[in-house]
């Protein structure tokens, strides 16, 4: 185990992360909300920590193995979550304890969406932007972003990429070089974010909120800039836009890459995981709409459909946005949506949960075992195409 080489890479990653403090710092300058000092302090502290880790080990360049790649990922998320808590600690508003600051930082980076903050509407814009930015970086994975940058600094990225990517997609290289794959993933990620922000802005959401919610939507994180979450805007159009982009982000990014490469939309429907993912969403929307309509929870059929569509997609993709309290819903529905969150999104997406592909493989495995009960000597193989990868 090359511990000094590992320390060098972690130091480089922390130095890169320190540069992200510039963005919320600029927001603080634009809105003059008084939070700029917290990000300035964090920038220098993170830069110092990264430099202390990197400088003594700057000449330690060794070939990374799989176990070292996994260790770097674990160390980096631990260190990054800790450094990411500093703006919450240094900021006068909100006045968080160290424990709450750590919780907020790790919740953002892991796109969990749980929060210790209340009174979001009165917080500085820079702090609100920083929370959304944490989720956005955590959504695709800063490690994947770093893989696109570190080769410039002489660090190989394959083992880091394999350790960071979830599920079967980790062995599917869309480009011959791993750095090119990482850049392609982030290009798609950025394009979706820009498209989502513009759509929300055109739908009537203020520019700051549109950018913030596009970050959390594409990352499937669930943080909002308001205590009432998406319900603050009271707009069926905004609800629909966010739900659509949550579905897009819940898909395998390998499929988005195929479309970007000039292939037709048919590539989506040919993917069995995508078909199951959409099938689950449609089934849940139909069930929720019918039950809500039968119990007269909302005044009109259109409102019922809109609320059902949004809440189903938000819960099933593990985003956690809300537009209304589901405590008003029949108890059967919240339990159903909670179960759907265990499935989550597709492999290679920003969604959480077990991943649809694993549920699909579980069904196929079960079907194979039933066949083997009837024909014990037969040989049955499980074949499944995921985007451009094969299992």
Regions from the PLM with identified roles:
Residues 1-390:
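Membrane-proximal intracellular helices of multi-pass ion channels
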């Amino acid at each position: 185990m090359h511990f000094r080489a590992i320390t060098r890479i972690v130091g480089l990653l922390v130095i890169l992360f320190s540069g992200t403090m510039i963005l919320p710092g600029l927001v603080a300058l634009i809105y003059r909300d008084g939070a700029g000092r917290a990000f300035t302090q964090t920038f220098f502290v993170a830069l110092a920590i990264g430099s202390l880790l990197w400088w003594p080990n700057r000449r330690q360049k060794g070939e990374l193995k799989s176990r070292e790649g996994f260790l770097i990922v674990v160390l980096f998320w631990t260190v990054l979550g800790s450094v990411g808590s500093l703006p919450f600690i240094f900021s006068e508003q909100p006045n968080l304890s160290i424990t709450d600051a750590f919780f907020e930082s790790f919740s953002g980076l892991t796109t969990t969406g749980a929060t210790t903050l209340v009174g979001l509407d009165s917080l500085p814009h820079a702090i609100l932007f920083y929370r959304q930015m944490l989720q956005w970086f955590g959504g695709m994975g800063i490690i994947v972003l770093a893989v696109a940058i570190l080769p410039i600094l002489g660090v190989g990225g394959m083992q880091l990429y394999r350790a960071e990517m979830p599920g079967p997609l980790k062995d599917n290289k869309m480009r011959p070089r791993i750095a090119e794959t990482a850049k392609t993933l982030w290009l798609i990620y950025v394009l979706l974010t820009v498209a989502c922000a513009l759509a929300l802005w055109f739908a009537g959401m203020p520019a700051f909120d549109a950018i913030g919610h596009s970050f959390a939507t594409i990352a499937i994180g669930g943080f909002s800039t308001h205590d009432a979450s998406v319900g603050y805007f009271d707009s069926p159009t905004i609800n629909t836009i966010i739900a659509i982009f949550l579905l897009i982000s819940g898909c395998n990014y390998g499929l988005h890459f195929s479309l970007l490469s000039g292939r037709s939309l048919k590539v989506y429907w040919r993917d069995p995981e995508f078909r199951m993912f959409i099938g689950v969403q449609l089934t849940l929307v139909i069930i929720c709409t019918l039950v809500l309509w039968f119990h007269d929870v909302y005044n009109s059929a259109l409102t019922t459909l809109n609320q059902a569509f949004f809440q189903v997609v938000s819960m099933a993709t593990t985003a956690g946005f809300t537009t209304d309290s589901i405590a008003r819903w029949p108890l059967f529905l919240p339990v159903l949506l909670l179960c759907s969150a265990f499935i989550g999104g597709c492999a290679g997406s920003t969604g959480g949960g077990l991943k649809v592909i694993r549920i699909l493989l579980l069904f196929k495995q079960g079907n194979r075992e039933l066949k083997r009960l009837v024909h014990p000597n037969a040989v049955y193989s499980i074949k499944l195409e995921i985007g451009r990868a094969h299992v």
